[in-house]
């Protein structure tokens, strides 16, 4: 374990040896209590509610600069992490703020249905609905509709990859760039790093429990859709260019590298950085550490380049 990450990593492993459905629910309550006190500085936060097909409401947070630029900027769909089973958009406010302060972009972040409430495809459907809403409201949000980005970390990174595959196949909305940060991609857990991993924050036992909840009756089935587990994808063509980073002692290390390398083999620009001795979510738990600061510096550099160079027009509406 990297010396800069060791102390908090050791404490985290002691506090939560593994996540179960019970601990997912418990920590989700804590997260929601803490974030209710969060008041973002230097950015504006709004809330909209979208009508789901089942007549329930999807809560979506919109984050934007307090003083918008005159010109239009990229629009980002940000998907929070939490093993598909916990969390909310507000937990990532500091990362979201970094993107906004970088170039004045607008970030749309759905409070998607957690797997403790409904299994796949509920979360995917929510995130896709939010992406379509971002496309349809680009003008109102001062967003370039040819620069829609999708990003997220952990389970949010997995959903980022899922949404980009789903959008490619549905052909209803174009995504210009994706950032699936240390993503949760493979339900099969067949890679070396995903097996017998007792790393801090997220380990093999937690991973198994989360996938069971997320997939429900699909768990351990051979025909799990690629939209649920993107590592099962075979056709990587026409996916958006991508960037990610990942630690090499966490469960998602191998599946992240494999996914990015397969994109590169398909001719998709895909850059990634591996951090030696870094565990899952190190950039959040040890945000002040040298590896974390470096990871976010490189992340923002890639985001800046994408903002300057990557565009993809929306398909004509039928």
Give names to the regions the model predicted.
Residues 11, 15, 44-318:
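Alpha/beta-hydrolase superfamily serine-hydrolase fold, recognizing
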Residues 2-49:
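An N-terminal hydrophobic leader/cap segment in hydrolases
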């Amino acid at each position: 374990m990297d010396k800069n990450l060791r102390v908090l990593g050791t404490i985290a492993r002691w506090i939560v040896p593994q996540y179960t459905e019970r601990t997912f629910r418990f920590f989700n309550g804590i997260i929601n209590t803490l974030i209710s006190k969060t008041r973002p500085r230097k950015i504006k936060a709004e809330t909209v509610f979208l009508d789901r097909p089942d007549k329930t409401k999807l809560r979506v947070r919109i984050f934007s600069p307090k003083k918008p630029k005159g010109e239009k900027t990229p629009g980002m769909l940000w998907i929070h992490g939490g093993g598909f089973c916990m969390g909310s958009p507000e937990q990532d406010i500091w990362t979201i703020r970094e993107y906004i302060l970088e170039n004045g972009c607008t970030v749309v972040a759905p409070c998607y249905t957690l797997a403790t409430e409904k299994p796949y495809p509920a979360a995917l459907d929510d995130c896709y609905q939010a992406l379509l809403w971002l496309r349809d409201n680009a003008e109102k949000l001062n967003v370039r509709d040819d620069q829609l980005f999708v990003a997220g970390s952990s389970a949010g990174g997995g959903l980022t990859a899922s949404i980009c595959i789903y959008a490619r196949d549905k052909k209803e909305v174009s995504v210009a760039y994706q950032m699936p940060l240390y993503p949760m991609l493979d339900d099969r857990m067949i890679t070396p790093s995903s097996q017998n991993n007792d790393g801090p924050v997220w380990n093999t036992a937690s991973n198994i429990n989360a996938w069971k909840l997320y997939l429900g009756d699909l768990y351990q089935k051979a025909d799990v859709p690629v939209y649920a587990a993107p590592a099962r994808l075979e056709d990587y063509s026409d996916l958006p260019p991508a960037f990610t980073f990942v630690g090499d002692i966490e469960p998602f290390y191998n599946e992240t590298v494999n996914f990015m390398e397969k994109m590169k083999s398909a001719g998709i620009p895909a850059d990634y950085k591996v951090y030696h001795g870094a565990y899952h979510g190190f950039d959040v738990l040890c945000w002040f550490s040298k590896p974390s600061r470096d990871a976010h510096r490189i992340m923002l550099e890639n985001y800046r380049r994408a903002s300057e160079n990557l565009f993809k027009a929306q398909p004509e509406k039928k």
